[in-house]
């Protein structure tokens, strides 16, 4: 990954603050490999990672108008935090769906699954 200069980061931030869509292209070009790796620490499936990153970049664009640049690295940290939050949200939603599925199973099936899982 190439290193972004502070001027380049500030340019992206200015574009984000203005709502300029080219800021997302620049952000993606610079940080997609890093953000993909961060997301992969939480989620294993490639399709899920792509979906999470898409949601994260949409959120970055939506929230970019209020992002406050605090110096070198703050843009990267902000983008990383959004990806982590989106990954955790995805995992919570998955767990909730799994719980709903398990709640609909008859009690004997739930007991059998629990017994198999524990052994």
What kind of feature is each model-predicted range?
Residues 37, 51-58, 62, 73-85:
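Structural recognition of an alpha-helix C-terminal capping motif at a helix-to-coil junction
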């Amino acid at each position: 990954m190439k290193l972004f200069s502070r001027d380049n980061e500030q340019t992206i931030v200015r574009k984000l603050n203005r709502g300029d869509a080219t800021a997302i292209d620049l952000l993606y070009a610079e940080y997609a490999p890093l953000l993909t790796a961060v997301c992969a620490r939480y989620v294993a499936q490639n399709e899920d990672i792509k979906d999470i990153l898409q949601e994260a970049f949409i959120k970055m664009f939506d929230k970019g108008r209020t992002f406050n640049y605090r110096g070198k690295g703050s843009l990267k940290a902000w983008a990383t935090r959004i990806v982590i939050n989106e990954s955790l949200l995805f995992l919570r939603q998955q767990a909730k769906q799994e719980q709903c599925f398990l709640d609909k199973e008859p009690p004997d099936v739930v007991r059998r699954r629990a017994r198999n899982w524990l052994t």
